[in-house]
A protein has these predicted regions:
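Core catalytic alpha/beta fold that binds nucleotide/phospho-ligands
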Residues: 1-124
C-alpha cells in the first residue's frame, strides 16, 4: 500500500513557475482531463499523489512520473503502468488500484496492490 498527500497550491505554484513541468509529470491525457475542469490544479494534484502512492506501494526507487498514468473514464480512476512501474508490477504479479480525493486545499491518493490469481483482475 502507498499513500500521498499534497497541498494543491504547492503544485499550482510549481507549474506556474515552470510551465513545462506539467509535460514531464503528466501524460497528454491527464493534462487534457484536468484542463477540462474548473480548477485543473486540483485534478493534477490528485494525479500527482496517485503517482507517488503507486511508486511507494511498488517500492520503486528509480522511475518516471509518466510511468504511472491515471486514466479517467466511467467510474473510479484506474492506472495504466509503463516502464519501470509496469515491470515491477509484473515481477510482483500484482495489479494496482487507486483511490483519489481532494478538497479545496489538499489532494490525496491511496494505492493498493493485489495479486491476480486466475489471470483476471480482482473484483472492484
Amino acid at each position: 500500500m502507498g499513500i500521498d498527500l499534497l497541498e494543491i497550491e504547492r503544485l499550482e505554484r510549481a507549474l506556474a513557475r515552470r510551465p513545462r513541468l506539467a509535460e514531464r509529470l503528466f501524460t497528454d491525457e491527464e493534462r487534457a482531463y484536468a484542463a477540462a475542469r474548473a480548477r485543473p490544479g486540483q485534478h493534477l494534484a490528485a494525479r500527482f499523489c496517485a503517482k507517488e502512492a503507486v511508486a511507494k506501494a511498488l517500492g520503486l526507487e528509480a522511475w518516471s512520473f509518466r510511468d504511472v498514468e491515471v486514466v479517467s473514464g466511467e467510474g473510479a480512476p484506474t492506472v495504466r503502468l509503463h516502464g519501470e512501474a509496469a515491470a515491477r508490477a509484473a515481477a510482483l504479479g500484482v495489479v494496482v488500484r487507486v483511490s483519489l480525493t481532494h478538497t479545496t486545499t489538499d489532494a490525496a491518493a491511496v494505492a493498493i496492490l493485489s495479486r491476480e490469481t486466475d489471470g483476471a483482475a480482482p473484483p472492484r
